[in-house]
Amino acid sequence: RYVMGDRCYDDANDHDIERMASVTREALKAGALGFSTSRFYGHLDKAGNLVPGTHAAAKEMLAIGGAFKGLGHGTIEIISDYLEDDDELNWIEQIMRDTGRTITTLTAPGKREKIWQLAEKMSQSGLSLRPQCGARPASILMSLEGTINPLAIFPSYKAIRQLPLDERIAHLADPAFREKIKTEQPIHHRNPDAKRFTTSYDEMYPLDDALSYEPGIKDSIAGLAEARGLEPLDVLMDTLAEQRQIIFFFGGYKGNLSPYFDNIARAHSVFGLSDGGAHCGVLCDASVPTYMLSYVARDRTVADTLPLEFIVHKMTQNTASVFGLNDRGVIAPGYLADFNIIDYAKLQLEPPKMVYDLPGDGKRLIQKANGYIATIKRGEVTFENGIATGALPGKLLRGGT
C-alpha cells in the first residue's frame, strides 16, 4: 500500500516492483532487521479484503529479495498458505541462492513437510531456511470477561452482557435463566471460524489448574458433559460461572502437544511467535518461555519432556541468530550480559487474568510467573523478584551493526 496506494489490490507493474525493492533496500540500509510478507488467507484488512501482497507474483517477491544482495544482513519472513506448492518453494529457494540470506516461514505439525525437506536441502548448500514452530497450537482464551464468550450467541445472554461480572455469574446460577438459554435459537456469526469456536464443544477445554495447555480429549466441554451425564451447554455455563478460562485450539488438536514439541526438536526449527499483546482480550502467549522451561522441560507427564539446556538455547542464541543478533544468547566475554536468574524449583505460571489498565479502561489478558529472582539486561538488573527496578538499559535494535 505504501508504494501502490489505492491500487494495492491490483497486480504490481514493473515500476511498482522496482519501487518496492528500492524501499526495502533503503530500510535495510537504515537498520531494518528484514522484510516480512503475508500470503495467508486469514489476514484481512478492516474491509474484509485479503491484505495487499497475498497474491504477489514470484517476479515481485524475487525483486524484493534482490534488495538484500550485497548488504550482508537481513532476514526474510514468510507466512504462506502455499508452502506445499512447488512454484512457491522454487522462488523461495531462488532468493536464498541469489542472496545467501536466511528465510524463516511459519509451519505447523502434520503439514508442509516439503518446507522441512527444502530446509535440509538448503543447509547442505550452507544456506539457512528456518521453519517456525509454535510451542502450542494457535488458540484463543474464552471467558465471561474475554473478548470472545461462547454464550454471547444467545439472546438472553446478550441482554445481560453489560452487567457487572458478579451479576452475570448470578444469572448463570439461576435455573430459569439457564433453561431459557438452552431453549432459544443462537445467533451465529457468519464467519465459519467464529461459529466454530462458539459451538464446537469438543474443541473447547477448560484451562486446567496445572496450566499444562495439554488437555486430553475427554477433558473437553463435550467430554466432561458425557462423563457427567449433562448437556454440553450446562458444563459450559458452569465452567464460565466458576470464572475459569476456556481454551479453544485451532489446527486440529489431537489430545497432546507431542507433534509440536517434535517439530521444535528438529534441527532447522526456530521458535515461532508467542503473542503477548496484539489480541489483548483474546490470548496471552507471552507466558510461553516460562511454560517451556517449567512444563515442557520439567513437569510434563503426558509424554517425554525436552532437555532444559536445549530449550534455553532454542529460545536465546538459536532464535537471535536467525535475525542476525549475534551479540546475545551466550554468557561469555564479548556478549551482552542479558540473562535471567531463576529459582527453578519455584518457577511456575499463574493463571491468565484480565486487567483493565489500557486507555479508556481497555482490557488485556496478563499471565504472571513466579520464580524469577532477577532479569539482567546489559549487566543492569531491570527486574528483581518480579518488580521493575526502573533501569532501562535497552537500546534500539538495528540490523547490520
Across the structure, where does each feature detected by a protein language model lie?
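Gly/His-enriched, cation/cofactor- and phosphate-binding structural elements
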Residues: 297-321
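Active-site neighborhoods of metal-dependent hydrolases
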Residues: 1-14, 20-66, 78-300, 304-305
